[in-house]
Amino acid sequence: MEQSLDGKTALVTGGSKGIGKAIAKGFTDAGAKVMITSRKAEVCESAADEIGGGCEWEAGNVGNPEHMEQAIDRTIEVFGGIDILVNNAATNPYAGPMIDADLPRWKKTIDVNMTAPFLWTQMVWQKYQKHNGGVILNIASVGGLETNPMLGVYDVTKAGLIHMTKQLAAELAPQVRVNAICPGLIKTDFARMLWEGDGGDMVAQQYPLKRLGEVEDIAAAALYLAADSGSWITGQAIVLDGGGQIKF
């Protein structure tokens, strides 16, 4: 089945490192023109150079509607459209029991992990995909499908993102396919506190496949869903966790 993205254009939020950068690299390798966006200009520029393939960048606060509109407009201006939107940017400023969370960090987590993906999707739909079709990919988490004593606030936002995926898939069909990817523990800087040292080995041993995920694992799934290979998939939350959901 075809997994080429020749002639396609993509916008990846949080695309300067980790999962977002790997997805952007996978898309450019498959022939797409990609715009990445993240907060720091120097990090975006360096990432775009490493990604190659004519990757462009637009720095700014991914939760700021003004930046969203600027990045979307520039992507359409430079590439002619946005066939694929990847809502990857996320934050996790609080770890601990959800009942003890303070309001500022609660609101920040919701703003970045739920409100921002909705606004990015809404703007891309209104400015391009409503009339041209496309694909939306939301990077959620297995945390959105289960409970965790220390990550409740983060997990609630990812559960919301998963349901948002299903709702928007129903609303935007047949023009746009909307799917979520739910990674388990991936070896990124974002999740370093969970996998560095003995903790990562302990988690890996709980997975039937006995290893932690790599960013390339997520990029491969994103490519499958974005390309024609995923043309009959929408409204799904695809779990990539080394079998963690089925462990004994």
Language model features with spans:
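Short C-terminal tail/terminal secondary-structure segment
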Residues: 92-95, 146, 223, 234-248
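Substrate-binding pocket helix/loop in short-chain dehydrogenase/reductase
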Residues: 96-98, 102-110, 191, 203
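Alpha-helical segment proximal to the catalytic Tyr-Lys
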Residues: 126, 169-174, 231
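Residue(s) in the substrate-gating loop at a strand-loop-helix junction
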Residues: 141
